[in-house]
């Protein structure tokens, strides 16, 4: 199979600070805009060796190109990233209860920019294996992944899960997972922003889920979780990136149901995210979010909507800049014109609400980066039967 994606666009924005000249240390009036191009291509081949063994090989290449311009200035800044990837995944069904997943993956990132970076390429190699067991009384998962990063060395991460059915309609799932994330090139080296002394993030997560089939058309899923992050990469203030110790406690609930032949989903999330040293709330994470989705199909046509609420949050690590909560409403429609062609229409933020999810400071005052107001999005999906 083949997957191809290409997306291009242009963005204009306001810059109250003006264009800063590093040679003269003077700011000039500016009318900046960006042009971007995001593309990816991947090919895969899958082999059913026998009834028990399936093997899949995938190769990919992706590009994220961005150029910054100024209508009042002739120069430009380029920031282009490239990634080559390869993955080999093997699935062995030993019997109806035991399954083993094993594989390797490789990525190589490259950076081309008008800015000077200390490093402009690195690779990551990984090997992983996971065993799954599904029995009548319980089920288990146990996995191990070994990463070798050219810049940040080697790291082992584990994951495990235990599922316990209770009666015919309920199931408890207890899980544990470890994470590893290397800083990006921007985090490390971007001029006047990056911190070359950053460490890689490491995390441990614990979660307890309850899945209940309350009725034929009503399903409830709830979970409580805790994530502890060592050396989380966090923006502090004044272009300062640091590693901090963080802790996130959360509760999530999802009620999926059918009403008048329409599919509905009510989702609630409660999050308490803290810097473990200062006790402050982590930046730009709302404590409470609530959303409701409703979709109905009429033959080849579909309609739906999403209502979303988010509570206040803080923009900075010291919790001095408060971001107000907000609510939005989206509606959507779809039409499967032919077996191969589908058309989608989305009206986002139909009540044209003004809101922000991040802020900046200028002349001692705080201002919000404005999110999109009323937006119309039209898309087409072509899926040829080759």
List the predicted regions and their residue ranges.
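Hydrophobic, lipid-facing positions within transmembrane beta-strands of outer-membrane proteins
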Residues: 39-43, 84-88, 125-129, 140, ...
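C-terminal beta-signal and terminal closure region of outer-membrane beta-barrel proteins
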Residues: 248-249, 354-386
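Surface-exposed extracellular loop regions of Gram-negative outer-membrane beta-barrel proteins
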Residues: 53-63, 67-69, 99-107, 114, ...
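Outer-membrane beta-barrel signature, preferentially recognizing the C-terminal barrel domain
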Residues: 26-40, 48, 82, 150-151, ...
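Flexible loop and strand-edge segments within Gram-negative outer membrane beta-barrel domains
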Residues: 1-85, 115-117
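Residue-level signature of outer-membrane beta-barrel architecture
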Residues: 45-51, 92-94, 131-135, 146, ...
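Gram-negative outer-membrane beta-barrel transporters
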Residues: 96-100, 134-139, 220, 224-228, ...
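Transmembrane beta-barrel strands of outer-membrane/channel proteins
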Residues: 2-6, 57-61, 86, 102-108, ...
